[in-house]
């Protein structure tokens, strides 16, 4: 049980460390308008992730362990995690450059920020694939435990994004993170590849 939690929670958090559209939207808004304005985006992103998590949980609970659909889900999750891990390993590194200029930049309200964050999360298909892959690791566990994992993931997304928004007000923090980003992406990629191998092994064992 502890091993499963560390594997799922670790993969989820490491994936958060690799910047995507949500990250840059939060950082730019925090730099231009402060972390309070950016917090609306953080809540919207968490809600969007929560929707994908709920769909992944509902889909998993509808599939019986050992069925052909269950095996297909495991293999699809394994292949996607392996692809994502390989992309991170071979990536030359994501460049973090945020323009701090405020000339002509509209000042979004908190509600507008929430809608922006929600749209950013929902329009990123990688979120749906990633959570479907993660929940394939939870196959066979009680539904109540799967739901707790979902609550945990939403909480971590919100907490991490709020931390990013608060830290983005300090350019030195952003620059320090950027210097270590390549190493973070490599560790994340290697971890996702190992998890993909584990999922594939489970799929073979269930044949």
Give the residues covered by each predicted segment:
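Alpha-helical membrane-protein architecture signal
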Residues: 6, 10, 107-119
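Core segments of transmembrane alpha-helices
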Residues: 78, 120-132, 189-192
